[in-house]
Amino acid sequence: MKATELREKSVEELNTELLNLLREQFNLRMQAASGQLQQTHVLKQLRRDVARVKTLLTEKAGA
């Protein structure tokens, strides 16, 4: 997910996106803990996507 795509979204859409990313991250962490996750790089990508969304939410709150 690109930051430019996220910048076009509203605060409500960003909050929804954040919730979805956190749910997906939780599910992938459970798969990794049980040894079922084959593509471990997805966890890193999700963590960075969460950080991007949180950063944009903070920027929009300050503006």
From Swiss-Prot:
State if Ribonucleoprotein is listed as a keyword: yes
Going by the UniProt record, its keywords in alphabetical order are: Ribonucleoprotein, Ribosomal protein
- The species this protein was found in: Erwinia tasmaniensis (strain DSM 17950 / CFBP 7177 / CIP 109463 / NCPPB 4357 / Et1/99)
PANTHER family given for it?
60S RIBOSOMAL PROTEIN L35/50S RIBOSOMAL PROTEIN L29, LARGE RIBOSOMAL SUBUNIT PROTEIN UL29C
Per the record, the similarity remark reads:
Belongs to the universal ribosomal protein uL29 family.
A Pfam family this chain is assigned to: Ribosomal_L29
Q: What is this protein called?
A: Large ribosomal subunit protein uL29
Q: Which HAMAP family match?
A: Ribosomal_uL29
GO MF annotations, alphabetized: structural constituent of ribosome
What domain of life? Bacteria
Q: Which GO terms describe its cellular component?
A: cytosolic large ribosomal subunit
Q: Which GO terms describe its biological process?
A: translation
